Amino acid sequence: MTIMRKNHPLLKIINHSFIDLPTPSNISAWWNFGSLLGICLMVQIITGLFLAMHYTSDTTTAFSSVTHICRDVNYGWLIRYAHANGASMFFICLFIHVGRGIYYGSYMLNETWNIGIILLLTTMATAFVGYVLPWGQMSFWGATVITNLLSAIPYIGTTLVEWIWGGFSVDKATLTRFFAFHFILPFIITALVLVHLLFLHETGSNNPSGLNSDSDKIPFHPYYTIKDILGVLLLLMVLMFLVLFFPDVLGDPDNYTPANPLNTPAHIKPEWYFLFAYAILRSIPNKLGGVLALLLSILILAAFPLLNSSKQHGLIYRPITQTLYWIFVANLLILTWIGGQPVEYPFTTIGQISSIMYFMIIVIFMPMASMVENNILKFI
């Protein structure tokens, strides 16, 4: 068997990626989230496939078909809520995975980091089009508001929006194409994941110390396969707890009302994992400025390798930048909270301050802290 896994053309690839892969001996539990994201993607594709067997992408029957899945299909409610809450678990793992990358300086693995940003954007697009499919009130109005943002693009904006809608408003054509996008995008994500892993295995994993670990590597199996299985069991336990006890805790009650173009909900807001970006969008009074800020809130991640001037890898021995990092995390949580609040004082002011802080910490404060820490090193 050993010879076969090392020589067989297909098994050889799996062997080099998951069995004999040389891995730093000191990587912590924060490195588990890559494999957890893989499990989340598998759960989403499998549950999504079964949902697609019963779902109809027509404005007259979409809401009814989701109700039918929950009421009449064997374990349909379980599949539907596993898919909905699986998306939340996916984004929790994604945010922690990106946060770990920032903390330990993994962004210096340029190709892996940039593919990761593309993966994040693709996953956000997939989640957005997926949220439209149940055709509830928040699905319809969320689709209307977010797609309408493209009208801020000079000259081509209005034409672009109507092209995406397939008409002059969000309607049957929009729902059909969003279902098509939602079906194909997870497979594109899977392909991007393979590219992400390909680039990662070219350089090898980063580690908590930030030092070169070539002299101290161990095989991925059995050490990290066992560690990952523990993470997977914990993830599935939390997911099942959510699905079986609090299936709607992360959803919006408005989405249990069928879509009505004549009745606008009091507060239009996206799913919780987009609220930080939504708060940044709302904090700028100008439409085009808001759209650019929304895009930059994600694309700014690409600036980390460019803005890094530290002589050390990661933040483990950098107390000033470490403090800024945790302020940044707290600020992100504040933005998430603000995104779900109505547009009124004091929420608008808090949102504007937090949005400015979000960009200033990354672009100004962290590079300045790096320079200060570099100078302190001279005196040690």
Swiss-Prot record:
The Swiss-Prot or TrEMBL record lists the needed cofactor(s) as: heme b
Q: At which positions is a ubiquinone bound? A: H201
Where in the cell? Mitochondrion inner membrane
Which species? Microryzomys minutus
Its placement in the membrane is given as: Multi-pass membrane protein
Q: What is this protein called?
A: Cytochrome b
Q: Which GO terms describe its molecular function?
A: metal ion binding; ubiquinol-cytochrome-c reductase activity
Co-factor binding comment: Binds 2 heme b groups non-covalently.
Arranged from A to Z, the UniProt key words for this protein are: Electron transport, Heme, Iron, Membrane, Metal-binding, Mitochondrion, Mitochondrion inner membrane, Respiratory chain, Transmembrane, Transmembrane helix, Transport, Ubiquinone
Q: Name one GO cellular component term.
A: mitochondrial inner membrane
Transmembrane stretches in the record are 33-53, 77-98, 113-133, 178-198, 226-246, 288-308, 320-340, 347-367
Recorded family membership: Belongs to the cytochrome b family.
What are the binding positions for heme b b562 in this chain? H83, H182
Per the record, the major location class is mitochondrion
User: Gene3D superfamilies from the xrefs?
Assistant: Cytochrome Bc1 Complex, Chain C
**What else does UniProt say about it?**
Heme 1 (or BL or b562) is low-potential and absorbs at about 562 nm, and heme 2 (or BH or b566) is high-potential and absorbs at about 566 nm.
Tell me which Gene Ontology terms the entry assigns under biological process.
mitochondrial electron transport, ubiquinol to cytochrome c
Which SUPFAM superfamilies does this chain map to?
a domain/subunit of cytochrome bc1 complex (Ubiquinol-cytochrome c reductase), Transmembrane di-heme cytochromes
Superkingdom per UniProt: Eukaryota
Annotated heme b b566 binding sites: H97, H196
**What role does it play?**
Component of the ubiquinol-cytochrome c reductase complex (complex III or cytochrome b-c1 complex) that is part of the mitochondrial respiratory chain. The b-c1 complex mediates electron transfer from ubiquinol to cytochrome c. Contributes to the generation of a proton gradient across the mitochondrial membrane that is then used for ATP synthesis.
Q: Assembly and partners?
A: The cytochrome bc1 complex contains 11 subunits: 3 respiratory subunits (MT-CYB, CYC1 and UQCRFS1), 2 core proteins (UQCRC1 and UQCRC2) and 6 low-molecular weight proteins (UQCRH/QCR6, UQCRB/QCR7, UQCRQ/QCR8, UQCR10/QCR9, UQCR11/QCR10 and a cleavage product of UQCRFS1). This cytochrome bc1 complex then forms a dimer.
